Amino acid sequence: MRKITHGNPIEIDTDDASARQIANQLRKLFPVYSVQELSPDDSIRRELVMIKVRAANSEDRNEVIQIANIFRASIIDVSLNSLTIAIIGAESKVDAIQKLLQGFGILEMVRTGMVALERGGSTINDNNKEKGEFNYGKLL
């Protein structure tokens, strides 16, 4: 499984040659400035999710708040019949809280998909300068 990141990552299950071809095609898209493959070991990956959950009574509301606290999520909106939770974390963490909240009734949910940065002090621009990689005829 390969992850190619250009803003939002694209997950593909392919060989190295096909992954390089896809990366080359992505570099031609506007406004892609840079493409870099990141391995799970060499990157920090997170996903942002907002979940609007039905919480029509105080008992449900308290349980939803407790679940949010356990996962270090934030309550970002409150109404008479619902709570909206924001959580940032690994895909497994997001999946786990989603599963727990389904019993209350998920009214709406949005997920960014996985975003990633390389670990350490180097940046994608540093790596591209070392490779002499060009986009739009300009060295990045």
Task: Please give the residue ranges for each predicted region.
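Long, contiguous binding/interaction regions
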Residues: M1-G7, E11-L140
